[in-house]
């Protein structure tokens, strides 16, 4: 390939990506789609610029307008989450977690968090952010039948182990975690409580999930691009008392420049969430429950039927124990992709953490299809597409044609100030 051909190659591949997504059912629980206004903001001159430090206290010149943008982000974040302090500079949820780990612990301290098979994010584990800080990770007691932390056993373990930091939240997250149950024990042993809300930040913002800052958490960290429908990035909400400490551990601790164009997009997404977040989050959870019920009725072993399956955006399926399914979770994930149904295989609590290539489960999320206008009726259709492949054993390429026709009807962004085409390719030249 000639160097001069690279721009055209990238444009062609990008257009293919847009069209593929237009014709696909998108069920990855850690993704979402932004509004056109957010995209426009992310494509501004801010992408070329650099800023270190806080608004009004920059180490670089030329920041007067990004100061306005970031100040607005901070104020809207505080309003949305009813927080005393917000830092919007983390470039991801993992970076937000790392900043809190550095602010509140020292090497050798104990961190209490979910194990990865029980739903903990990899950044909670010794191989990632927790290990970078040199923390000793102890795991929350977990009840796989309830798909949640065992609150009584957790309190006992806090009193016995005396962790420095107690972390809630995770990647497999169908139900609120027992934050309030941990508060008294945490106070007794001198532990701080932090909540990784990366997956459920949009549901918290929409007032449809738990409110960790009111339940005893001093920190709420999160990604701004999962159930929260902004550009990729991270945020930390905390108290006034923690403000200087966390700000200094974000910069210069773990962030230098903080992707200024994404802050412009984030400001718009925050405004959208303040305006539309409650209705959006309600529908996300309604859709998750409807999808879970429809799959369960079609022979999938959807976990926690006795609890109405889920209280979040996530639907968890144990493929290995679904009697009518002869494929593995890994095989099915690939087959669904061939049919333009995009989802992921996932470890479940009874899986070996080292067997992530061949886990028992599949994880689904309803946040993106909700933003594209789908409701409960469409969840029935999605479940039927999934059944045709997993149980009826139809060829993925045959199902794909029906999926494409279905998905193309849902390409308009909802819950935004500009209900435009979510998959239109925007050209600059």
Swiss-Prot record:
Domain of life: Archaea
GO molecular function, one term: glycine hydroxymethyltransferase activity
Positions contributing to (6S)-5,6,7,8-tetrahydrofolate binding: 120-122
InterPro entries: PyrdxlP-dep_Trfase (IPR015424), PyrdxlP-dep_Trfase_major (IPR015421), PyrdxlP-dep_Trfase_small (IPR015422), Ser_HO-MeTrfase (IPR001085), Ser_HO-MeTrfase-like (IPR049943), Ser_HO-MeTrfase_PLP_BS (IPR019798), SHMT-like_dom (IPR039429)
Any Pfam family the entry gives: SHMT
Keywords: Amino-acid biosynthesis, Cytoplasm, Lyase, One-carbon metabolism, Pyridoxal phosphate, Transferase
Any single Gene Ontology cellular-component annotation: cytoplasm
Xref: CDD domains: SHMT
UniProt catalytic activity: 5,10-methylenetetrahydromethanopterin + glycine + H2O = 5,6,7,8-tetrahydromethanopterin + L-serine; L-allo-threonine = acetaldehyde + glycine
Major subcellular location class: cytoplasm
Localization in the cell: Cytoplasm
Residues under site feature: Plays an important role in substrate specificity: 225
Known pathway: Amino-acid biosynthesis; glycine biosynthesis; glycine from L-serine: step 1/1
Residue(s) carrying N6-(pyridoxal phosphate)lysine: 226
Keyword Membrane tagged: no
GO terms of biological process kind: glycine biosynthetic process from serine; tetrahydrofolate interconversion; tetrahydrofolate metabolic process
EC code: 2.1.2.-, 4.1.2.49
Function noted in UniProt: Catalyzes the reversible interconversion of serine and glycine with tetrahydromethanopterin (H4MPT) serving as the one-carbon carrier. The use of tetrahydrofolate (THF or H4PteGlu) as the pteridine substrate is 450-fold less efficient than that of H4MPT. Also exhibits a pteridine-independent aldolase activity toward beta-hydroxyamino acids, producing glycine and aldehydes, via a retro-aldol mechanism. Thus, is able to catalyze the cleavage of L-allo-threonine and L-threo-beta-phenylserine.
PANTHER family named among the record's database cross-references: SERINE HYDROXYMETHYLTRANSFERASE, SERINE HYDROXYMETHYLTRANSFERASE 1
Protein name: Serine hydroxymethyltransferase
Native organism taxonomy: Archaea, Methanobacteriati, Methanobacteriota, Methanomada group, Methanococci
């Amino acid at each position: 390939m000639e160097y001069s051909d690279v721009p055209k190659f990238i444009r062609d591949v990008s257009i293919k990506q847009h069209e593929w997504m237009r014709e696909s059912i998108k069920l990855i629980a850690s993704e979402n789609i932004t509004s056109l206004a957010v995209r426009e903001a992310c494509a501004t001159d801010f992408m070329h610029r650099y800023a270190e430090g806080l608004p009004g206290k920059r180490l670089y010149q030329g920041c007067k307008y990004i100061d306005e943008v970031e100040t607005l982000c901070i104020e809207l974040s505080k309003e949305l989450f009813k927080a005393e302090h917000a830092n919007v500079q983390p470039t991801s949820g993992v970076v937000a977690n790392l900043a809190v780990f550095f602010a509140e612990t020292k090497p050798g301290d104990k961190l209490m968090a979910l194990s990865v098979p029980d739903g903990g994010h990899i950044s909670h584990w010794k191989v990632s952010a927790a290990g970078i800080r040199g923390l000793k990770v102890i795991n929350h007691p977990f009840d796989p039948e309830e798909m949640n932390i065992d609150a009584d056993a957790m309190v006992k373990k806090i009193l016995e182990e005396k962790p420095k930091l107690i972390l809630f939240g995770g990647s497999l997250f169908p139900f609120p975690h027992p934050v309030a149950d941990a508060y008294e024990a945490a106070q007794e042993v001198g532990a701080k409580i932090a909540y990784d809300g990366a997956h459920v930040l949009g549901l918290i913002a929409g007032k449809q999930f738990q409110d960790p800052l009111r339940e005893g958490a001093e920190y709420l960290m999160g990604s701004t691009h999962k159930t929260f429908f902004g550009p990729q990035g991270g945020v930390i909400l905390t108290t006034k008392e923690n403000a200087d400490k966390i700000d200094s551990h974000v910069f210069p601790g773990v962030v230098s420049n903080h992707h200024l164009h994404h802050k412009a997009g984030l400001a718009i997404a925050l405004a959208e969430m303040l305006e539309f977040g409650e209705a959006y989050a309600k529908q996300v959870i309604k859709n998750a429950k409807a999808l879970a019920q429809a799959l369960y009725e079609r022979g999938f072993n959807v976990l926690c039927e006795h609890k109405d399956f889920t209280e979040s955006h996530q639907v968890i399926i144990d493929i290995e124990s679904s009697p009518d399914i002869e494929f593995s979770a890994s095989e099915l994930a690939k087959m669904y992709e061939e049919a333009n149904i995009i989802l992921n295989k996932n470890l479940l609590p009874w899986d070996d953490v080292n067997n992530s290539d061949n886990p028992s489960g599949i994880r689904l999320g309803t946040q993106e299809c909700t933003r594209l206008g789908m409701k409960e009726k469409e969840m029935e259709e999605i479940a039927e597409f999934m059944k045709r492949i997993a149980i009826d054993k139809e060829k993925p390429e045959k199902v794909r044609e029906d999926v494409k026709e279905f998905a193309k009807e849902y390409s308009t962004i909802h819950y935004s100030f500009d209900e435009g085409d979510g998959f239109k390719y925007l050209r600059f030249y």
